[in-house]
A protein has these predicted regions:
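Enzyme catalytic cores with a strong preference for nitrogen-chemistry domains
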Residues: 1-185
Length: 185
């Protein structure tokens, strides 16, 4: 059971339908304790061939529709935004998957930002060095931005990282568990 001030932050695919078009997004949503939508962020930097098919419209126009048959690309979000949770009095920058790897592109109202949340599905790396490399970028961004990073990775490394890149709490990819963040500065 959720408490009154609890919030749920999770990754989910969302669909927006306007007039005669529909778009699918890789999204992070924030829900209140009654599961009402507080805020959402749609991923901007999409993974080629994983989240979108490059040249999909071109292939369709020249008669190679079979290449993209049954495939519906994600749409890119429009802008990065700071998410504010008023009843918790905190603000965070949402980053989905590999958006965390881009240096120098996060700074968004830095003085108002308490931390960065990065959610990721690292299962596509398989049994490789990939999840560890991806996780390392979370530490780099914490240091670069001078912010705490909360990273939740399905089939990857989850962690709470200090602004100096120190791992406060970590769950390896094979571990099940919860990282509870009680406070931050």
């Amino acid at each position: 059971k959720f408490k009154e001030k609890d919030v749920i932050i999770m990754g989910i695919n969302t669909k927006k339908i306007t007039n005669d078009t529909s778009k699918i997004f890789n999204s992070m949503v924030v829900l209140d304790n009654q599961l009402n939508l507080i805020s959402e962020y749609n991923k901007i930097k999409l993974v080629p061939f994983g989240e979108f098919l490059p040249f999909e419209k071109f292939f369709n126009k020249i008669g190679l529709k079979k290449i993209s048959y049954g495939y519906e690309s994600f749409s890119s979000g429009y802008q990065r935004k700071l998410i504010s949770i008023k009843n918790k009095n905190f603000n965070f920058i949402p980053l989905i998957c590999y958006e965390i790897i881009y240096s120098g592109r996060i700074n968004l109202n830095s003085d108002k930002t308490n931390f960065i949340i990065n959610i990721s599905e690292d299962g596509w790396f398989g049994n490789s060095i990939g999840p560890y490399q991806h996780f390392s970028h979370s530490k780099f961004r914490a240091i670069e931005e001078g912010k705490y990073v909360i990273r939740s990775a399905n089939n990857g490394i989850s962690a709470y990282i200090s602004p100096k890149g120190k791992i406060i709490h970590e769950l390896e990819s094979t571990q099940k568990g919860v990282i509870e963040v009680k406070k931050f500065k």
